[in-house]
Amino acid sequence: MAPSKQYDEGGQLQLMDAERIEEEEECFESIDKLISQGINSGDVKKLQDAGIYTCNGLMMHTKKSLTGIKGLSEAKVDKICEAAEKLLSQGFMTGSDLLIKRKSVVRITTGSQALDELLGGGIETLCITEAFGEFRSGKTQLAHTLCVSTQLPIHMHGGNGKVAYIDTEGTFRPERIVPIAERFGMDANAVLDNIIYARAYTYEHQYNLLLGLAAKMAEEPFRLLIVDSVIALFRVDFSGRGELAERQQKLAQMLSRLTKIAEEFNVAVYITNQVIADPGGGMFITDPKKPAGGHVLAHAATIRLMLRKGKGEQRVCKIFDAPNLPEGEAVFQVTSGGIMDAKD
């Protein structure tokens, strides 16, 4: 494997040592290891062609979907799954073991200490964090800041990894990354080189981009996936109540894929969401809004953040839903250097 890169405190790229690379590889078992269990290399290649690059990812597929891969019979799929189960521990574990496993979670700084404290340390890996709010509420600005902070070393509250950015609204600006990188004392060109970007134009294109990400994440140390915004293309490609059921089904499939990516490669998934009018929001609430996507999106996102505008460049983040965080709010500020603590 070619040596990977990381930043020192001065922002310069440094080669990661072999021990660090081994730690990254321990997050998942390569699909190539099936060969040692008696699986034909040709069948392994078929799995890779279908976008399956790890044994962890393989076990996240149903046998029905695996038999849909050209050249894989039911007998072959049974044998492949049996071999993967031998390489992985997929059964029950104790709460203590799960607590130890949770120590692999990386929390990536948002750039604001107040916001980090609200989130228990930052944006978590192994789960989906959703931020929703009106336009100019800070969703995309937070995404740009995370593009940089993710590349900081672990001891600087970063993720020590690369970033994948799927843009559905055309709002990503590479020139915005430059002053944010300078704020963190990092080389802007090196930071941009560690961000892979794709513009999605249809919900199908968006889903296919996610399928192609597995190959890159299996080879390189990614720590963050951003989808900005997750719902925009679904609202365009499906219209009216007649297509609502199909839209929600396709949305559920894409969100399931995001969850699998988060857990398979130990990456943080940050998605932004739009808001819609809420007729049942209550007569005492001025212009009530709720996140788009309905129950499907509500159940898929592990942590849901509601962003709203404050005074001037200040923004307010509220914990809308989280399994391990108490309700609360934090005020932060949007500056040329990205997300920062609000100034009085």
Swiss-Prot record:
Keywords attached to this entry: ATP-binding, Cell cycle, DNA-binding, Meiosis, Nucleotide-binding, Nucleus
PROSITE patterns linked: RECA_2 (PS50162), RECA_3 (PS50163)
Tissue specificity of this protein: Highly expressed in spikelets. Expressed in meiotic young panicles.
Single GO MF descriptor: ATP-dependent DNA damage sensor activity
BP GO terms, sorted: chromosome organization involved in meiotic cell cycle; DNA recombinase assembly; DNA strand invasion; mitotic recombination; reciprocal meiotic recombination; synaptonemal complex assembly
Compartments, record wording: Nucleus
Job description of the protein: Recombinase that may participate in meiotic recombination, specifically in homologous strand assimilation, which is required for the resolution of meiotic double-strand breaks. Exhibits DNA-dependent ATPase activity when bound to single-stranded DNA (ssDNA). Mediates renaturation of homologous complementary strands as well as assimilation of single strands into homologous supercoiled duplexes leading to D-loop formation. Binds circular single-stranded DNA (ssDNA) and circular double-stranded DNA (dsDNA) in vitro. Catalyzes DNA homologous renaturation and DNA strand exchange.
Protein name (record): Meiotic recombination protein DMC1 homolog B
Gene symbol of the encoding locus: DMC1B
